[in-house]
Design a protein with these regions (language model features):
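N-terminal prepro-regions of secreted/extracellular proteins
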Residues: 1-116
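Mature secreted bioactive peptide module from preproproteins
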Residues: 89-209
Length: 209
């Protein structure tokens, strides 16, 4: 009887562990061909930020299928619409003293988003921190890249390299992002942000290879 109780206890513990582990790892071994609307919905439910789940739930069945197809197919992923926005903000209130001759510290941010059927799947932001004096950009302090959103379970994004420079009175910061789809290389996306002394900003995104 003791052996039977031990075996039953071991089985019960194993079953409980499976219930705890599966929801968080269901997409980790997911192959592109196996990704479905149902499994993707479960993936979104496991995310800490529920905004993507809410947006996805509002889509029609056809739109959901289009999103999932886009996530599975690398060729469709490259065709996703990219929306961008750029902003410049002062790092401190002292930066608002535009009439002074002291150097001012500013940050330009440029965000690129990939969408499928109106649903945002990835969002990458590049920040360039720089100094200005009067109407001139004097130097770049640093460049940073942040994956602010990635709800494609088949895609991993990492920073491959970075570069910063000053040209034509603009501060530039560039990040090369390495994309992988289902653990296979899917090319490099180069994202550049720039800022000026007057507060103008912008950027660009291009596929390197």
């Amino acid at each position: 009887m003791a052996k039977k109780r031990t075996f039953f206890s071991f089985f019960l513990i194993s079953a409980l562990l499976c219930l705890l582990v599966v929801p968080n790892s269901v997409m980790a071994s997911e192959k592109p061909a196996h990704l479905t609307v149902a499994s993707y919905t479960q993936f979104l439910k496991a995310q800490s930020d529920k905004s993507s789940l809410y947006e996805f739930s509002k889509l029609s069945r056809q739109q959901k299928q289009k999103v999932v197809q886009s996530l599975k197919d690398p060729s469709l992923l490259k065709m996703d619409i990219e929306e961008t926005s750029g902003t410049v903000e002062a790092a401190s209130t002292a930066a608002y003293g535009a009439r002074t001759a002291s150097p001012l510290f500013k940050t330009a941010a440029y965000t690129a988003s990939c969408k499928a059927a109106g649903f945002t799947t990835t969002k990458l932001t590049v920040y360039v921190d720089y100094y200005t004096k009067n109407s001139s950009v004097t130097s770049v302090k640093s460049v940073r890249g942040v994956v602010t959103k990635n709800v494609n379970p088949l895609v991993s994004i990492s920073k491959k390299s970075s570069k910063s420079w000053v040209q034509n009175n603009r501060a530039y910061g560039r990040i090369d992002w390495q994309w992988k789809i289902a653990a296979k290389n899917a090319g490099i996306k180069r994202q550049t942000a720039y800022g000026t002394a007057s507060g103008a900003s912008g950027g660009s995104t291009a596929t390197v290879n």
